[in-house]
Amino acid sequence: MGIIRFQILNPTRICRSTIYYMSCRYLPSSSSSSSPLRVSSSSSQKPSFDFSRRWHFGHPDHHQQYQKPGEEGEKIFRLGLTADIGLSVAKALTGYLCGSTAIIADAAHSVSDVVLSGVALVSYRAANVPKDKEHPYGHGKFETLGALGISAMLLATGSGIAWHALDLLSIALSAAPEVIHSGHHHGIDMNHPILALTVTIASISIKEGLYWITKRAGEKQGSGLMMANAWHHRSDAISSLVALVGVGGSILGVNFLDPLAGLVVSTMIVNAGLKTGHQSILELVDAAIPAQQLEPIRQTILQVEGVKGCHRLRGRRAGSSLYLDVHIVVDPFSSVSVAHEVGEYVRRQINLNHPEVSEVFIHIDPAFLQFSCSTKDHDSITKESNICQEIKHVEATVSDIFSSQLSEKLTIKRITPHLLHSKILLQIVVAMPSTMSIQDVMIAAEHAEKEILKAAPNVARVSIQLSLNSE
């Protein structure tokens, strides 16, 4: 059996390809010779849309793949927390023994790092907890709330250090002439400069090492939280470098460098608190992700076969997780199952190439065809009308035309309506008597098409296909 097309709807190639895929996927090979789908797919144009090779990208398997990296990420956070605790104690003791404001300020910064690392670890654990009934969209917001609390603490700590540093700086500057004339300075006791320098240099080295370790792990897992924590380690290294300048100034007798370095460190802390708080507030109010950050995801979508375009790509963050919404455009004449398959493959490709995406909501739109109507009667369906009722009315009209005018010539087997750009397009499959010639069928089909377009003003195009199936 087969199908003879009297009027081919655009695009022809994809219509045939759709039938071909459905026959290859769901029909056994032994029945291919008698299948109407096989005959229709025997076109010389080879379809290019193949789903059978891609079905192995299962959604559950994907999540199992990233369970082990989650454990590795937790180890990285624990390492950072341990290092911050050790550095906080070492800097506090060194700053007290050496009398260095810069080192004490850096120690206070390290104490805030301990809290930050602890919250990051807890947030990382909470963010990786599976979804449940109470949290159907995951637990990423817990991480955001923790970051907002940390930003408030950073602002308070930085402001206190700045106040203390300004007080010491004013004292140092007012006492500077007397220090110069007396030849005496209130710098670090010469019994402790090596201790101060050693601890400060060790802090810089450890923090820079943590930066590279965390950065590599973050890039490997695609974790935004780990990447942010890595840059936080680097900012700590820079603040320790500033403290090193203050220690050097105190050793040389330049008293104002020590509180000045503490003031610079406090500025860095306040800046980090402002940035963290701003980002957290944006996440809590579901601010949109910048378009340039979504461009790689857009390219991934457009590379999928069967996707003719995408629009309304938008995203929001919940901690280190990214949630997406996107509309993809597919062939308007593909079946529901094929269009769904295209959407699922887009989802799998996004999860495969962008692990930071926790969930993506895909809406499937048909590609609009460019066609012109011959009369003004073929206007778009008004928004107030019920589309389902309109389609039922059109189907009833078509049935009446065939039963009243063509009952002895053609019999309707199936009516498939398409709604494109507020226009109704009809695909009608008919059967003919065995005694009727093909030429007579073509004449009858042309007559039916004209009558349908005349009786149904909402119909813009009609395609009548002849089925040779005897059943």
Curated annotation (Swiss-Prot):
GO MF annotation terms: monoatomic cation transmembrane transporter activity
NCBIfam families linked: CDF
Topological domain spans for side Vacuolar: 100-101, 166-192, 258-423
Domain of life, per lineage: Eukaryota
Compartments, as annotated in UniProt: Vacuole membrane
Organism (species): Arabidopsis thaliana
Regions of this protein lying in the Cytoplasmic compartment: 1-78, 123-144, 214-236, 445-471
Membrane protein topology class: Multi-pass membrane protein
GO terms for cellular component: vacuolar membrane
Transmembrane segments: 79-99, 102-122, 145-165, 193-213, 237-257, 424-444
One Pfam family per UniProt: ZT_dimer
UniProt similarity note: Belongs to the cation diffusion facilitator (CDF) transporter (TC 2.A.4) family.
The protein, known as: Metal tolerance protein C1
Keywords noted in UniProt: Membrane, Transmembrane, Transmembrane helix, Transport, Vacuole
Purpose of the protein: Involved in sequestration of excess metal in the cytoplasm into vacuoles to maintain metal homeostasis.
Keyword set includes Transport: yes
